[in-house]
From Swiss-Prot:
Protein name, as recorded: Photosystem I P700 chlorophyll a apoprotein A2
One Pfam family of this chain: PsaA_PsaB
GO biological process: photosynthesis
UniProt membrane topology term: Multi-pass membrane protein
Matching NCBIfam families: psaB (TIGR01336)
Residues reported in the UniProt entry to bind [4Fe-4S] cluster: 559, 568
Cellular localisation: Plastid, Chloroplast thylakoid membrane
Entry coiled-coil feature ranges: none
C-alpha cells in the first residue's frame, strides 16, 4: 500500500475517514507526537525549521524593498516627505473599469497603486537610504541572506552537521552567545551604521562603500575615544533649525543626550538613538560574558538558582530544581520566550507613536494608527501563546518529584487563591466600570449631563506631572520649576525632554481626564479577565476540582459527555480558545481608545473625545458610527473613490467574522447529518457521481470546529477594524 498522509503517524494514516486529513494537518508541527521521534531528532527538527523561518522573513523583507524600488516613488517622496504619498506597489488588475483606475492612480504614479501605511519609507529614509538603487541593493542582499538561511537549514539536517542534544542543552553558552552576539554585537553594528551612514545622510552627506573609509563620521575621528574625552562626541549637536537631509543647521556631534524631538521631523534625534544603541551594546557585551562555560569563570545558572533561598524560608525551597525543569522542557522555554516577546511587541506599539524614531512618521497619521494597531494585535496573539505553551509544559513536561516545594510547586498548591483573586478583580472592575458608563448614559438620555459621575485620574496625572508635565498644576518633581531636578534637567541631561512633554503637537504624555479614567478601567477589566482565563487554563492543565486526572487526556480533549461530571470546556485548550476572544475584545478597546483620542488630537477638537467618551452612546455614536460613515454609505452618485476598497474590505471582514459563528454555535450531529445528505445526493447525481473519494466524510471534531470558528472570528474581526482604521484616518488626513 502506498504511503498516505500523514507519514509521521501510521495510526492516522490508516484512518478511513476525513479525520485523517484534518488531524494530520493539526499535528504536523507537534513533533513530539510523531512516530519514531527521539529527543535528539526533535531538537534537530526545530533547529532546522528556524533557518526556514529566517529564510521566509528575509525573502519577505527583500520583497518589500524590491517592490518599492520597482513600482514605488521613493526618490520623489524623499524630496518632499510630508506631501507625497508613499506607494507600496502597483495594482496589476484594477477591476470595475475606468473609475477604479482613476481612483487608485495617486502619489504621482502612472497607473493604479496601493499607498504604503507601514512606515517603511520613513524608516529607510531615516537610516540613510536615498535612491532606488539603494533599495535594490538591500533587496538583493536580503535575498542572498535568505538563500544562505535555506542552505543552513538543509546543512543542519545532514548527518555530519546535526548538533547533538548536549549542544542544545548547553544553556550558559547559548545565553552568552545570544546576549553578546545577538544583542551586543548587532547593537554595536547598528550604532556603527547610524554613525557612519545615517547621521551623515541626515546632514546631506552621502556615504556608501566607495567613500566609507574616506569620510570621517566626526571631525576628530577616534582621538576623543582613546584620550578619554568622550564628551567631545556630544558637542555641537544639530541645531533646532536643522533641515533633515541637508547640511543647513547641522552640527558635528555623533553621540548626544538632547532628549525631545527634532523640530522639523518630529522624531527622536538620530544622535540620541546612536548613543542609546552604543549603551545597549556595551551592556549586552558585558552580560554575554557572565556565564560559566569552558573557561571556569563566571556564573553557573544552576548554582545561581539553587543558591537562591527565599528569606525566612517563606517560599519553601525557592528555585531548587528549576534549572533542569526549564532546560529539559522546550514548552517552558517557548512560553518564556513568547511572554517576553509579547511584552516587547506591545511596548513597540506604545513607543513607536509616543517616541517616534523615524523622520516624519509622526506626521503620517494613518501610518501611526496602522502601526500601533498592528503591534498591539500581534502582542495579544503572542502573549496568549505563552500561556498555551505554559499549559502544555504542565501536562507533558512537569515532574512533581523534581520540583517539590519550589516556586513552581507552590504556584500549583495555592492556585485556588490566585484564581479567586483574579476572578474578584475582574468582577470588581467589570461591574464598577459598566455601572459608571451606564449611569452616565442614562443621565445623557434624560438631558441632565451635569449629573454624570466624572472621576479625574489624579494619580495618573500626578505621575505625568512627576515626569515634567506642567498643565495639571501639581508642581511636583520635574514639573516643579524651582526643584533641583528641574534645573539640572535644563542643562545637564535631556534638555529637550521638558519642552517635548509640554508641547501639544506630539503624543508624549497626553492630557487625560474622566473619559480616559473610564476606558482605562474597561481595558483593565479586559486584561484581568484574559489573564484569569489563561492562568486558570495553565494551572488547571493537569487536574482541576471537577476532573483531577487530566494528565493522560492531553492538552486538547473534547467534551466527553456527563461521565466524570462532564468535561466540557475544561481542557487547557478550551481555556486558550476562550481567552483569545477576550484578548481580541480587550485589544479592540485599546485600539478604539488610542485611535479616537488621536483623531481628535490631530483634528484639533480634543473636546469631542473628552465630552463623548464618558458614556457608551458617545463611543458608539461619535467614534464608531461617525467614523465608519464613509464605509457604509453604500452606492452613491459619485461612483468610485480611493476608499471603496476599504468599504468592500469592511463588508468582507464582517462576512468572515459572522461565518465564525456558524462553527462556534452548532453541534457535530447537525453537520454529520448535513454531510451524509450531501454525500447521498452526490452519489445519485449523474456526472457528479463520477468523482469518488476514499475517505468517508465525517464532521469536524468539537475542538477542530472551535478552531475553525475562532480563526474566522479573529481574521474577520481584524480585517473589519483594519479597513475602518485606515479608511477613517486616511479619509480625514489624506
Amino acid at each position: 500500500m502506498a504511503l498516505r498522509f500523514p507519514r509521521f503517524s501510521q495510526g492516522l494514516a490508516q484512518d478511513p475517514t476525513t479525520r485523517r486529513i484534518w488531524f494530520g494537518i493539526a499535528t504536523a508541527h507537534d513533533f513530539e507526537s510523531h512516530d519514531d521521534i527521539t529527543e535528539e531528532r526533535l531538537y534537530q527538527n526545530i533547529f532546522a525549521s528556524h533557518f526556514g523561518q529566517l529564510a521566509i522573513i528575509f525573502l519577505w523583507t527583500s520583497g518589500n524593498l524590491f517592490h518599492v524600488a520597482w513600482q514605488g516613488n521613493f526618490e520623489t517622496w524623499v524630496q518632499d516627505p510630508l506631501h507625497v504619498r508613499p506607494i507600496a506597489h502597483a495594482i496589476w488588475d484594477p477591476h470595475f473599469g475606468q473609475p477604479a483606475v482613476e481612483a487608485f492612480t495617486r502619489g504621482g504614479a502612472l497607473g493604479p497603486v496601493n499607498i504604503a501605511y507601514s512606515g517603511v519609507y520613513q524608516w529607510w529614509y531615516t537610516i540613510g537610504l536615498r535612491t532606488n538603487e539603494d533599495l535594490y541593493t538591500g533587496a538583493l542582499f536580503l535575498l542572498f541572506l535568505s538563500a544562505i538561511s535555506l542552505i543552513g537549514g538543509w546543512l543542519h539536517l545532514q548527518p555530519k552537521w546535526k548538533p547533538r542534544v548536549s549542544w542544545f542543552k548547553n544553556a550558559e553558552s547559548r545565553l552568552n552567545h545570544h546576549l553578546s552576539g545577538l544583542f551586543g554585537v548587532s547593537s554595536l553594528a547598528w550604532t556603527g551604521h547610524l554613525v557612519h551612514v545615517a547621521i551623515p545622510a541626515s546632514r546631506g552627506e552621502y556615504v556608501r562603500w566607495n567613500n566609507l573609509l574616506n569620510v570621517l563620521p566626526h571631525p576628530q575621528g577616534l582621538g576623543p575615544l582613546f584620550t578619554g574625552q568622550w564628551n567631545l562626541y556630544a558637542q555641537n549637536p544639530d541645531s533646532s533649525s536643522h533641515l533633515f537631509g541637508t547640511s543647513q543647521g547641522s552640527g558635528t556631534a555623533i553621540l548626544t543626550l538632547l532628549g525631545g524631538f527634532h523640530p522639523q521631523t518630529q522624531s527622536l534625534w538620530l544622535t540620541d538613538i546612536a548613543h542609546h544603541h552604543l549603551a545597549i551594546a556595551i551592556l549586552f557585551l558585558i552580560a554575554g560574558h557572565m556565564y560559566r562555560t569552558n573557561f571556569g569563570i563566571g556564573h553557573s545558572i544552576k548554582d545561581l538558582l539553587e543558591a537562591h533561598i527565599p528569606p525566612g524560608g517563606r517560599l519553601g525551597r525557592g528555585h531548587k530544581g528549576l534549572y533542569d525543569t526549564i532546560n529539559n522542557s522546550i514548552h517552558f522555554q517557548l512560553g518564556l520566550a513568547l511572554a517576553s516577546l509579547g511584552v516587547i511587541t506591545s511596548l513597540v506599539a506604545q513607543h513607536m507613536y509616543s517616541l517616534p524614531a523615524y523622520a516624519f512618521i509622526a506626521q503620517d497619521f494613518t501610518t501611526q494608527a496602522a502601526l500601533y494597531t498592528h503591534h498591539q494585535y500581534i502582542a495579544g496573539f503572542i502573549m496568549t501563546g505563552a500561556f498555551a505553551h505554559g499549559a502544555i509544559f504542565f501536562i507533558r513536561d512537569y515532574n512533581p518529584e523534581q520540583n517539590e516545594d519550589n516556586v513552581l510547586a507552590r504556584m500549583l498548591d495555592h492556585k485556588e487563591a490566585i484564581i479567586s483573586h483574579l476572578s474578584w478583580a475582574s468582577l470588581f472592575l467589570g461591574f464598577h466600570t459598566l455601572g459608571l458608563y451606564v449611569h452616565n448614559d442614562v443621565m445623557l438620555a434624560f438631558g441632565t449631563p451635569e449629573k454624570q459621575i466624572l472621576i479625574e485620574p489624579i494619580f495618573a496625572q500626578w505621575i505625568q506631572s512627576a515626569h515634567g508635565k506642567t498643565s495639571y498644576g501639581f508642581d511636583v518633581l520635574l514639573s516643579s520649576t524651582n526643584g533641583p531636578a528641574f534645573n539640572a534637567g535644563r542643562s545637564i541631561w535631556l534638555p529637550g525632554w521638558l519642552n517635548a512633554i509640554n508641547e501639544n503637537s506630539n503624543s508624549l504624555f497626553l492630557t487625560i481626564g474622566p473619559g480616559d479614567f473610564l476606558v482605562h478601567h474597561a481595558i483593565a477589566l479586559g486584561l484581568h479577565t484574559t489573564t484569569l482565563i489563561l492562568v486558570k487554563g495553565a494551572l488547571d492543565a493537569r487536574g482541576s476540582k471537577l476532573m483531577p486526572d487530566k494528565k493522560d487526556f492531553g492538552y486538547s480533549f473534547p467534551c466527553d459527555g456527563p461521565g466524570r461530571g462532564g468535561t466540557c470546556d475544561i481542557s487547557a485548550w478550551d481555556a486558550f480558545y476562550l481567552a483569545v476572544f477576550w484578548m481580541l475584545n480587550t485589544i479592540g478597546w485599546v485600539t478604539f481608545y488610542w485611535h479616537w483620542k488621536h483623531i481628535t488630537l490631530w483634528q484639533g477638537n480634543v473636546s469631542q473625545f473628552n465630552e463623548s467618551s464618558t458614556y457608551l452612546m458617545g463611543w458608539l455614536r461619535d467614534y464608531l458610527w461617525l467614523n465608519s460613515s464613509q464605509l457604509i454609505n453604500g452606492y452613491n452618485p459619485f461612483g468610485m473613490n480611493s476608499l471603496s476598497v476599504w468599504a468592500w474590505m469592511f463588508l468582507f471582514g464582517h462576512l468572515v467574522w459572522a461565518t465564525g459563528f456558524m462553527f462556534l454555535i452548532s453541534w457535530r450531529g447537525y453537520w454529520q447529518e448535513l454531510i451524509e445528505t450531501l454525500a447521498w445526493a452526490h452519489e445519485r447525481t449523474p456526472l457528479a457521481n463520477l468523482i469518488r473519494w476514499k475517505d468517508k466524510p465525517v464532521a469536524l471534531s468539537i475542538v477542530q470546529a472551535r478552531l475553525v470558528g475562532l480563526a474566522h472570528f479573529s481574521v474577520g474581526y481584524i480585517f473589519t477594524y483594519a479597513a475602518f482604521l485606515i479608511a477613517s484616518t486616511s479619509g480625514k488626513f489624506g
